[in-house]
Amino acid sequence: MKNKYCLYEKDWQKAKAALLLAKNFGLILDDSLEALEERRKEKNEENRHKQEKGELFYGPCFYTPPMYLQYELTRFRLDFVQPSEKIKQLGVCPSFTREERLNFYENNHDLFGRYHGDYFTFEDVEQIIDKRLREEAYDKLIQNILCQSD
C-alpha cells in the first residue's frame, strides 16, 4: 500500500514520523495508512459535494494518494509553524526571545537580502524569523521520532 504514495523509504519513514507526531498532538486520531486513506476519501467526497453544489473551495477537486499525503504533511507543519488553536492549547510550540531571533537574523543575513544588495531590517522580518525557528523546532521533533524508531 505504501508504494502508491511514491516515496523512497527514507522519505516514507519521515512521513510516518510526521503522522505519529500529528497523532500525539491530537491533530488526527489514527496515524495508520488505512486511516490516511479514509481521510483522503472523505476529503475527496467533501470536495465532490462542494463542486456539485457550485460552492467555491480551495485545492484540487480530487486528491491522489501522494497529493493527499503531501497535503496532510503540509497542514501539520503549518499547524505548528503558525500555531493552530490546538497546538497553542498543548503548549508544545516554542516561543523565542528577541535575542534568539536577532541571533538567527545575524547568522542568516543572506536570507534577508533584496535585489539591489540592501537588506530587510530585523523588524521587517521578525515574524518570518519566528516561523523559521518554529520550522526548525518541528523538524527536530520529527528527527527525535526517527531516532527513537532506529
Language-model-derived ranges and their functions:
Residues 53-150:
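PPIase-associated folding chaperone regions across multiple families
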Residues 1-68:
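N-terminal targeting/tethering segments
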